[in-house]
Structure formats: C-alpha cells, structure tokens
Amino acid sequence: MRVLCFAVFLLSLMSFANSAYSTQNTIATIDKVLVVKSERKLHLMHRDTVVKSYRVSLGKKSGPKQYEGDQRTPEGIYAINWRKHSDNFNLSMHISYPNAKDVQRSQESGLPPGGMIMLHGTPNDEEYPEWFFNTLDWTEGCIALTNPDMKEVWEAVQDGTLIEIRP
C-alpha cells in the first residue's frame, strides 16, 4: 500500500512539474498580441498561431482613435513598452500609442493624438461585480480584460512585444 501511495505521489509530482514547465515554455514563446476589435478578442500569438484568446472590453465609442479624449481604442501596430501595478485597474501594460501614422494624422487635423493607452484589468469597484465590466465597452480607449485574464497576459507577454490592434 505504501508503494502504491508513493507511486501516486510521484506521478502527481511529475504531472505538476510538466504543467509548470509547459506554462513557462508557452509564456516564453509569445511574440505578438493581436486584438481584433470587431470580435472583442485578444489573441496571444506565437509564429502566427493563436496560443490563447481572451474576451476584451474597448473604448466606449467605435472606430479608430482620432484624437485625445475621443473614447476610442486605437488601431495599428504598437508595442507593449512598460507595465505597472495600478491602484484603479490592478495590473496594466502600456501600449506605445501614438505611432508615426497617428502623430501625422494628429498634425494634419490639428488635434492632439492623446496617449496613455493601456492593456489593463477591471476596476477595483465594490458597487459592480467584475463580470459586469466584461459585458460592455466602458474604457476611455484602453483594452480591458478580467483581472484573472490580465494576470495571465501579464505573465505571458514581455515588454517590447508587438501588439497589433485591428478593426
């Protein structure tokens, strides 16, 4: 009986070690984040293959970001360039908006492009449950995930990773 219990223990331990190893390998292989606004999806990518997908919430207004304060989520190619722990939204990762095209459009329109577009979790709000925020577009132009999903993305995506935001 002891031998059987020990064998079960060893198998469990090996299974845990394997899952931890494969998670670390998956995390190390994310080379792109793809957001498809029309699908409300964020995809973690490795060599053009989707590794994992998440539902997201976007800016309150549809269409590409035009100027500061328009409550739209930008569209284009950017990078995740820094991260922080946020008092309001738990974990957050900065998206390098505006890019050169955004700056050019801004100069042509005479309106500031804005900035501080983040990939972040849901608010620390006692009045509304977390699932509520994942059912609608509520941000000022950022991309929001549930806090557990944001934690996974935080662990999987390195600073400097490309993020493409499509319509």
PLM ranges: what are they?
Residues 72, 82-167:
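Exported/periplasmic cell-wall-interacting domains
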Residues 5-15:
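Bacterial N-terminal signal peptides
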Residues 20-64, 167:
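Intrinsically disordered, low-complexity
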